[in-house]
Design a protein with these regions (language model features):
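Solvent-exposed, polar/charged alpha-helical surfaces in well-ordered, non-transmembrane soluble domains
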Residues: 91-99, 195, 199, 203-207, ...
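Beta-lactam-recognizing serine transpeptidase/beta-lactamase-like catalytic domain environment
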Residues: 70, 76, 283-300, 309, ...
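Residue-level detector of secondary-structure boundary/capping sites
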Residues: 57, 88, 196, 225, ...
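A general boundary/transition motif marking the beginning of the first structured unit of a protein
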Residues: 85, 193, 222, 257, ...
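A short acidic, often aromatic-flanked loop/helix-cap motif at beta-alpha or helix-coil junctions
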Residues: 223-225, 314, 491-492
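Membrane-proximal periplasmic segments of bacterial cell-envelope enzymes
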Residues: 1-273, 277-298, 326-344, 350, ...
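Compositionally biased, intrinsically disordered low-complexity segments
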Residues: 16, 21, 218, 308, ...
Length: 575
């Protein structure tokens, strides 16, 4: 009897609790539909507002007279707005947009460092190591020795693509999903799927938008290189930021989906060219239709960089270089320049250090860099190699004036000093190098005129290798020029360098007194860049005052109304 009463009591309590819950639901429903119904209806009709970042226009680059090298053009990008792409539909929508891109023969951004086909392999490009490391972290903190096949399987599992029969398609979709995760795409940061698409594709995407939620078209800007061959030796290119670069940049200024200067002035002047992001508030209705878009914080475009280059002189330098190489090939013997197939030319203002022209041959067009990269990278003529700033070459007789300057500065010779040239230098019994001529007794002026080896053998011997190297450095050889972009340092002959370079010989070679003779005429281990040789000759012409070489003349605001910086001449040293 007691058990029955206890059961009845519990049943009564349960009934009361359930009744209270239903009463609560009823009250809430009444509040939503009757008391606050109009208010909530108005909110739904008004839509939802979210904030989106606005990309700034990248600063442009002009020649010294305002003629364009690198400018911007208006483009259209495909973006994936995560806020309106339910996770359950992501793979399906991405499959549809990929199919449309392939149908139109267009490419999309895919930085997944794994091949499209099985057996899956890792990519081997220059940034592969950091990209693969980042991929393994995102795929599931895989170990360093995990192979590409296992990594891909893990990624397909992660993105629910492991049961897809078409493995190549699964790889493509995974590439997009990976990039979305890697770049931090979210409701306020859309993912850029493809850049600079043609207007025909813009129209088609708008037609199919009802079937591809989250796929949108955004107006943007892209780099355009005017006369791309003329700027290839110093302008540089931009590209999507990679994992290694992202580790180095200020995260408050860059997104993983940003483009960044990769080399040349695009890289050196990145902070000047980048600009500052703005903010836009976008109001959308319940179906995702944009009701309004308001810029609440305008983007600030990057600055305009005025270079020191004279575009006309640059064009003349490139034409002249190509013409001279062809002339040498057609008229000279093979051992006297007939095999020449490449070169560089640099023109410098001796008083200011401004680089007026800097050209390489063979060259390439910046506009075609990415589309032709696979061919350019394996071209045996190395058009991508910047011979002006990074190629180092034995200078030969160009080096002789530095020995003459050193000899006079150290009191070894003066203007009237005479050296006997009898064709053979006989100071050593076991090593007697020769001159091409037999000039008799000559002074420095005549020795330079006829490029007499004997005069500089003797002057160099009396100076000693340390003084020769020191004065060469003071005149601009084997030291940084000051240029803003990447450069090789070259090297000046010294006993230490000589033995270091020959340590692997059997037996290893050691420095001897006779080596100074070859160093004195620009041979042995002397190797310098064309840019350094231009700095050196400019220093000689400027009475020993070595100027810092530079490519940036002035920095102005994007609209050219305000001068941000004017680069003044800088004296590095006086010899």
């Amino acid at each position: 009897m007691k058990k029955q009463n206890s059961f009845g009591l519990r049943l009564l309590i349960l009934t009361l609790v359930i009744s209270m819950v239903f009463v609560g639901f009823a009250v809430r429903l009444m509040s939503l539909q009757i008391v606050h119904g109009d208010e909530y209806k108005e909110q739904v009709q008004q839509g939802v507002t979210y904030r989106q970042q606005v990309e700034p226009a990248r600063g442009e680059m002009l020649d010294r007279y305002g003629r364009p090298f690198a400018v911007n053009k208006v483009t259209y990008d495909i973006i994936i707005n995560v806020a309106y792409l339910p996770s359950s539909q992501r793979n399906g929508v991405i499959e549809k947009i990929i199919a449309l891109m392939e149908q139109e023969g267009q490419e999309w951004i895919d930085n997944l460092p794994i091949s499209y086909t099985e057996p899956f392999t890792f990519s081997t490009d220059e940034n592969a190591e950091s990209s693969i490391r980042n991929l393994k972290r995102i795929a599931g903190n895989l170990t360093a020795d995990t192979n590409a096949q296992t990594t891909m399987e893990q990624l397909l599992e992660k993105y629910d693509l492991h049961e897809m029969a078409d493995r190549r398609l699964a790889r493509k979709i995974a590439g997009v999903r990976y990039e979305m995760e890697r770049t931090g795409a979210n409701s306020t940061t859309p993912y850029t799927f493809a850049k600079d698409i043609p207007m025909e594709l813009v129209v088609k995407i708008q037609e199919y938008s009802f079937d591809m939620p989250g796929i949108e078209i955004a107006q943007s800007t892209a780099r355009e290189y005017v006369d791309g061959q003329l700027g290839s030796s110093f302008i540089g290119i931009t590209g999507l930021i990679n994992a290694e670069e992202y580790e180095r940049v200020d995260k408050s200024l860059y997104l993983y989906s940003d483009r960044i200067g990769k080399n040349g002035l695009e890289k050196a002047a990145e902070s000047l060219l980048k600009g500052t992001r703005g903010t836009r508030e976008i109001l959308v209705d319940a179906k995702g239709n944009v009701l309004s878009s308001t810029v609440t914080e305008p983007a600030i475009p990057g600055n305009t960089v005025i270079t020191t280059i004279d575009k006309d002189l640059q064009a003349a330098a490139l034409r002249g270089l190509e013409k001279q190489i062809a002339h040498m090939q057609n008229t000279m013997a093979e051992d006297d320049g007939g095999l020449a197939d490449a070169g560089a030319v640099v023109a410098v203002d001796v008083k200011t250090g401004e680089i007026l022209a800097m050209a390489n041959y063979p060259t390439f067009d910046l506009s075609d860099y990415y589309s032709n990269y696979s061919e350019l990278a394996v071209d045996p003529m190395q058009p991508l190699f910047n011979r002006s700033t990074q190629g180092t070459y034995v200078p030969g007789s160009i080096f002789k004036p530095s020995v003459g300057v050193a000899g006079m500065a150290e009191g070894i010779i003066d203007r009237d000093s005479l050296v006997e040239c009898n064709h053979i230098y006989t100071r050593f019994t076991d090593y007697q190098p020769r001159c091409l001529g037999n000039h008799g007794r000559i002074d420095l002026n005549f020795a330079l005129t006829v490029s007499c080896n004997i005069f500089f053998y003797d002057t160099g011997y009396l100076l000693g290798i340390d003084k020769i190297a020191d004065y060469a450095n003071q005149l601009g050889l084997g030291v940084p020029t000051g240029i803003e972009i990447e450069e090789s340092l070259g090297r000046t002959s010294t006993p230490e360098l000589f033995e270091q370079l020959r340590a692997h010989y059997d037996p290893p070679e050691t420095w001897s007194a006779g080596n100074v003779l070859q160093a004195s005429i620009g041979q042995l281990d002397n190797k310098f860049t064309p840019l350094q040789l231009a700095s050196y000759t400019a220093t000689l012409a400027n009475n020993g005052q070595r100027m810092k070489l530079h490519l940036i003349r002035e920095v102005k605001s994007y609209d050219l109304e305000e001068t941000i910086e004017t680069v003044e001449p800088v004296v590095l040293n006086t010899c």
